[in-house]
Every structure is written in structure tokens, then in C-alpha cells.
UniProtKB/Swiss-Prot annotation:
Signal sequence bounds: none
rRNA-binding recorded as keyword: no
SS bond list: none
Source taxon at top rank: Bacteria
Segments for region (Disordered): 600-634
Species classification: Bacteria, Pseudomonadati, Pseudomonadota, Alphaproteobacteria, Hyphomicrobiales
Name of this chain's protein: Chaperone protein DnaK
Similarity annotation: Belongs to the heat shock protein 70 family.
Compositional bias of kind Basic and acidic residues: 611-634
Length: 634
């Protein structure tokens, strides 16, 4: 039976593992190493190098050596994080025809999925050489905070590499699987995962083979690469002070600085001081220049302290979302190479109030967890159930631009949720479903994932048609949205495509803005709610005036018309209290009209309210499609 492999596709290094019976095994590559640098290079004669061979020649070939490509996967060219990356890497990042960020070497363009596929192919070949048989299926890990576009792009990379990706699994969850596989008893663990390019924290409850993620948070543009950049900038600045030459303008020198910075960073995890020695780093009219500098651990920690502190807030949010305190965490598991740094361990210990668990290899534990999940899918690993979550809320835009959530963040996946909405106008025959993701109260402040139309709705008074909107998130965290007219059973659906995915900048902005603007959001939500209620009352009152025009006195009619005009007069304003007050006046006038009608005694029986709105139906901000297929605003 063919084996399913587990792959940790990392920013800096990648790793592959497989289950041997009930035991996961990390597979060594052709160079004899258990991890492979996530680097792809193209030589002068067009040869493609992957892993250690690519890394070895990076200093002399910086413009055709692609590293940290994971930071670009699933991102658009205009993404702020892409712009940031452009200033950090020596290779060329370009705008693809679809607006995505791609890379270029020797006039050839490559998508990040393609470059990632070359790394995955190396992992595949490593596994095949060890197993002695072809491998066609894999479980691949991604940061827990990866968005839909990034997950889709990772699946694409697997497909390009010739792998059927059976499951996309979150890295902290994979680490928890590896950690908890042979543990007895129940407990709550926090997985602190600071890798080469991303940071994640997940809170999980483990017991009796069940791994349930309670919450997750993170930053997909924070990791070891940023620590390297800080050190490179420091070295370049020190060299400029001493020699008056800016090494930042020399790509070859920058690549040597990066290599030296990475080496120094690693050495300072075990030593308190290291020496950086780069002879012939550059030259000027006076001759060759050399860079020699002693770097202490304390100085390095000072350079990157703010980066380490940036990991604390996501930890705090994850605990809050899980409804737990730091004291309720039984164990903190460290994942990712950067967690070897003593200062990182110190910050983790300070926040959680306990010594972090160091019993797992931070470079290998994610791949091991992926192999365990592969074993579960293949049936080799029994009695293990994994329950993961979606990192952000999902919903649609409804009347007044409000974001109506169907699925809240940190909901266990796979999940499916339906809600019934209705039309905003009489005789509306089509609606536009606009799908958003985020945490803000107003749809416009969140990320538009996509939109689609549901047409052919039978004409009816507003509020009568029933449109069922269903969100379906699969175990990979990939979203499907369906809308169905319950009267005709007509249905439309959209699968959120990679081009419509979220950027990391968007995710961070959504969550941070949600906190900063919480009060503002609440005020705007109250205003929209008040307007919606007022407009509904105006609609109802005007309808009553039309239907019972000949059955009420001129005085009652004038009073109601005045109340309607009064409400309309404040609707465009921003004063919530004024809208509520005028709406209350209109409600009183409507009641008096009703009382007057009953006192007068209606000749006919009870009137049929053909367009009565149902309490459990939410008005949606949809658009009407006329006979000429041109949409009008609702």
C-alpha cells in the first residue's frame, strides 16, 4: 500500500516524515540532513538547484536564488507585505497578469506556488528514495493564520509537485499531534510556534486521543527572517560608520551579510558572544575592505526585542478567545527554530508563568505531526481525532452595509451554517450575495472574498422571498458559499478562489482595527440598525396610508404624514437618538391611526397583509436585476 507522507513546508527549512507502523520517522535527504533549506536557485546554464546546493551558491548568485518564498504565496503584488518583502530580498518580485506577486529570473516568471512546488518535489523524492516506492499523496502544513488564498496556493504547489494533498493542516496543530501522541491523560496546551517567517499560537485541549483546538492567533510576517534582517541592517550600519561605504546597495555583500547574520543568530543561542568576520566584503579606491565585529547575545537581544514582544499580544488574544488564563495552561510546547533563542524562551516563560516544554525537536515536530495526520487518514493511526478551527469570522453584507456573521472565528471545522435572508425591495427578482471575512461590524471594513448573483426570484413584496445562504468550510479551511431561493430551489454557489484570498496585512488590519475602533463600530452599527428600523416603519406606515386612505380622517392622515416626513428628515443624519425619537413618534401616530380605524368600525373583515415581514428574516442589501439585466441599487 502506497504511503502518505507528511511535509512541513517551512519558510526557512522544510522537513518530511512518514509513519512506520505507529511510529513517525523523519526522513534524511540526499545530503544526509533531516531538514532541507527552502531555497530554489537557477544557475547560469539554467540548471535548477533545490535545498543545500541552492543555499551554498546563494552568495555568488543572489538575484536567481529564491528564499523565504512562503512569504509571497497567495499574496497579491499590491499587498503591503509584498512591498515590505521587496526591500528585504535580492531577487526580483513582479506583478503577474492576475495581480499576484510572482518572481523572475533570467526573464522567466515563476509563481510562489511553482517555487514551493520545487521544494515539495525535493521532499517527495527524499521520501521515495527512503521508501523505495512512488509517493503520490501528502499532508502539508501551513501556518494556522494562513488565509484562504494562501491555503489554496499551497494546495496548488502540491499539485504542481505531483502530489495529491489529502489535507492542509495547521502547523501548531500538527506539533500538538506529535507532542500528544503518546501522552496519557487530559490537559490544555499552548503551542508557541516561531519559525523562519511566521508566528502562530494555538490553544488545544488534549485527552483520550482527541485534539481540539480552542483558539488560534498569529502573524504570518514575523519570524527568523526578520531577526536576520535586523542583524544585517546593524552590520551594514556599523560598517558604514567605520568605512563610509553603504553595503545595502551591494546585493552580493548583502547576501554575505545575511549568511553571516543567520550563522551568528544560531551561535548566540548557545554562546554569549560571537565574532563576525567577512574578509573582502567590498572595496574602494584605497583597496579591499573587511568586516570584523564582535557581537554579544545581549546586543542581539536588544536589536530584536520588539520582534519578540510582538508575539505576546497574539498569545493574549488566543487565551482570551479560548476563555482561559495563563495559569490554566498545563504545558507550553515550543515549535520553530527561533524558539531556541534564550530570550524567546524567557518571554514565553514570563507570559505563561511556567517553564516551556523542550522535549520536542522544534525543527521536526511539525513534519512528525503531519505524518501522524497522514497515518490517521490512511488508517494506520487509530483513535486520534483532530478538531481544528477557522481563524476569522465569515459572513455576508446585509441592509445598510452591515456585516452579518454566519461563522464566528475559532469555530471548529469542518462546519456548515445556513441562515435565511430576504429582499430589500418589492418585486425584487435578483440578489447579489457579497461574501466577507473579518471582525469589523461594517462589511466595508472587512475583506471582500467574492460575490455572486442569484436570479429568477419570483416577484413578491419585500421580506417575503426566503433566500437561504449557506457557508461550508472544509477540513482544509477552504470556503464554499451557496445561496438558494427556497420557493424555486434555484441555487448559485461560489468557491473562494486564490485570487480573492486575504493578505496578511488585511488579516492583521481587521483584527487590530476591530479592537481600536470597537466603540466606533458599535456607534455605526447602532446608526444603521436605527435607520433600518425607521425605514421599515416608514414603509409600513406609507403602505397603511395607501390601503386605508378612504377609511381614516384627514386629521389622522395628516398626523401620520407629518410623522413620516419627520422620520425621513433625520434619516440621512448621524444622530441615532434623533432617529429613534422620530421613529417612536411615528410608531405612536401609526397606533392612533389603527385605533381610529377600529373605532370607526371597518365594514370588511381583517385585511390581508401580503407583504408582512417576518421577525426571523433579515433584510439583505441586495440589488435588483431588471429585464435589461442592468442592476439597480437596492
Amino acid at each position: 500500500m502506497a504511503k502518505v507522507i507528511g511535509i512541513d513546508l517551512g519558510t526557512t527549512n522544510s522537513c518530511v516524515a512518514v509513519m512506520e507502523g505507529t511510529t513517525p520517522k523523519v526522513i534524511e535527504n540526499a545530503e544526509g540532513a533531516r531538514t532541507t533549506p527552502s531555497i530554489v536557485a537557477f544557475t547560469d546554464d539554467g540548471e535548477r538547484l533545490v535545498g543545500q546546493p541552492a543555499k551554498r551558491q546563494s552568495v555568488t548568485n543572489p538575484e536567481r536564488t529564491f528564499f523565504a518564498i512562503k512569504r509571497l504565496i497567495g499574496r497579491t503584488y499590491d499587498d503591503p507585505m509584498t512591498k515590505k518583502d521587496m526591500g528585504l530580498v535580492p531577487y526580483k518580485i513582479i506583478r503577474a497578469s492576475n495581480g499576484d506577486a510572482w518572481v523572475e529570473a533570467d526573464g522567466k516568471q515563476y509563481s510562489p506556488s511553482q517555487i514551493s512546488a520545487f521544494i515539495l518535489q525535493k521532499m517527495k523524492e527524499t521520501a521515495e528514495a527512503y521508501l523505495g516506492q512512488p509517493v503520490s499523496q501528502a499532508v502539508i502544513t501551513v501556518p494556522a493564520y494562513f488565509n484562504d488564498a494562501q491555503r489554496q496556493a499551497t494546495k496548488d504547489a502540491g499539485k504542481i509537485a505531483g502530489l495529491e494533498v489529502l489535507r492542509i493542516i495547521n502547523e501548531p496543530t500538527a506539533a500538538a499531534l506529535a507532542y500528544g501522541l503518546d501522552k496519557k491523560g487530559a490537559g490544555v496546551i499552548a503551542v508557541y510556534d516561531l519559525g523562519g517567517g511566521t508566528f502562530d499560537v494555538s490553544i488545544l485541549e488534549i485527552g483520550d486521543g482527541v485534539f481540539e483546538v480552542k483558539s488560534t492567533n498569529g502573524d504570518t510576517f514575523l519570524g527568523g527572517e526578520d531577526f536576520d534582517v535586523r542583524l544585517v541592517e546593524y552590520l551594514a550600519d556599523e560598517f558604514k560608520k567605520e568605512n563610509g561605504i553603504d553595503l545595502k546597495k551591494d546585493k552580493l555583500a548583502l547576501q554575505r551579510l545575511k549568511e553571516a547574520a543567520e550563522k551568528a543568530k544560531i551561535e548566540l543561542s548557545s554562546a554569549t558572544q560571537t565574532e563576525i568576520n567577512l574578509p573582502y566584503i567590498t572595496a574602494d579606491a584605497t583597496g579591499p575592505k573587511h568586516l570584523t565585529l564582535k557581537l554579544t547575545r545581549a546586543k542581539f537581544e536588544a536589536l530584536v526585542d520588539d520582534l519578540i514582544q510582538k508575539t505576546v499580544e497574539p498569545c493574549r488574544k488566543a487565551l482570551k478567545d479560548a476563555g482561559l488564563t495563563a495559569g490554566e495552561i498545563n504545558e507550553v510546547v515550543l515549535v520553530g527554530g527561533m524558539t531556541r533563542m534564550p530570550k524567546v524562551q524567557e518571554v514565553v516563560k514570563s507570559f505563561f508563568g511556567k517553564e516551556p516544554h523542550k522535549g520536542v525537536n522544534p525543527d521536526e515536530v511539525v513534519a512528525i505531526g503531519a505524518a501522524v495526520q497522514a497515518g490517521v487518514l490512511q488508517g494506520d493511526v487509530k483513535d486520534v481525532l483532530l478538531l481544528d478551527v477557522t481563524p476569522l469570522s465569515l459572513g455576508i453584507e446585509t441592509l445598510g452595509g452591515v456585516f452579518t456573521r454566519l461563522i464566528d472565528r475559532n469555530t471548529t471545522i469542518p462546519t456548515k451554517k445556513s441562515q435565511v435572508f430576504s429582499t430589500a425591495e418589492d418585486n425584487q427578482t435578483a440578489v447579489t450575495i457579497r461574501v466577507f471575512q473579518g471582525e469589523r461590524e461594517m462589511a466595508a471594513d472587512n475583506k471582500l472574498l467574492g460575490q455572486f448573483d442569484l436570479v429568477g426570484i419570483p416577484g413578491a413584496p419585500r421580506g417575503v422571498p426566503q433566500i437561504e445562504v449557506t457557508f461550508d468550510i472544509d477540513a482544509n479551511g477552504i470556503v464554499n458559499v451557496t445561496a438558494k431561493d427556497k420557493a424555486t430551489n434555484k441555487e448559485q454557489q461560489i468557491r473562494i478562489q486564490a485570487s480573492g484570498g486575504l493578505s496578511e496585512g488585511d488579516i492583521d488590519k481587521m483584527v487590530k482595527d476591530a479592537e481600536v475602533h470597537a466603540a466606533e463600530d458599535k456607534k455605526r452599527r447602532e446608526l444603521v440598525d436605527a435607520r433600518n428600523q425607521a425605514e421599515a416603519m416608514v414603509h409600513s406606515a406609507e403602505k397603511s396610508l395607501t390601503e386605508f386612505a378612504g377609511k381614516v380622517s384627514d386629521a389622522d392622515k395628516s398626523a401620520l404624514e407629518a410623522a413620516i416626513a419627520s422620520v425621513k428628515g433625520v434619516l440621512e443624519g448621524e444622530d441615532v437618538e434623533a432617529i429613534k425619537a422620530r421613529s417612536n413618534d411615528l410608531a405612536q401616530a401609526s397606533m392612533k391611526l389603527g385605533e381610529a380605524m377600529y373605532k370607526a368600525g371597518a365594514e370588511a373583515g381583517p385585511q390581508e397583509g401580503g407583504g408582512a415581514e417576518k421577525d426571523d428574516v433579515i433584510d439583505a442589501d441586495f440589488k435588483e436585476v431588471g429585464p435589461d439585466d442592468k442592476k439597480k441599487s437596492a
